Amino acid sequence: ANQLILFIMVFGLYVIAHGHLTPGGGFQGGAVIVSGVVMLLVAFSSQELKKSVRERILTIMESSGALIFIVLAFAGLGTVFFYNFLVGTPIFGRIPPTGPGSGDFWTGGFVPLMNFAVGLKVIAGLSSVVLAMALFASGEESEE
């Protein structure tokens, strides 16, 4: 479990980051990352995982993901819906190629950033659900 968790997390981040180019996105990548949390839960006990994961941190992560998504949605509405604000900046100065399958990471405008916000929300939400189910199954109650 200790050797696989890094690969699962990196693959989940890859799925989140490239969701606008390939099948995937924030929800799918978040679910992949939470499958790593489930693997840790199976390999170790729920009490061990409860020591390292706090409910408050998961709540803050989930709320932050929703807030970031809403802010980016309104920022995109300010100019053109999902306007690619990265074009013309010193780092990404060239105009990206258009058309399906261009393969350039920065052609998605706000969509990759919104995928990260959705991924953050899904990771926190599903982790909370999985940990609550594990603690309930072990006979321990949550401290809410």
Predicted segments — roles?
Residues 130-144:
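Cytoplasmic juxtamembrane regions at transmembrane-helix boundaries
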Residues 20-34:
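Short, non-helical or kinked segments that cap or interrupt transmembrane helices
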Residues 2-21:
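Short, hydrophobic/aliphatic alpha-helical segments
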Residues 71-98:
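Juxtamembrane non-transmembrane "cap" segments at the membrane-aqueous interface
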Residues 102-127:
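Hydrophobic alpha-helical transmembrane segments
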Residues 33-42:
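Alpha-helical transmembrane segments and their membrane-interface exit regions
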Residues 1-8, 49-74:
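Interfacial and helix-entry/exit segments of alpha-helical transmembrane bundles
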Residues 43-56, 107-111:
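A cytosolic-side transmembrane-helix exit/cap motif
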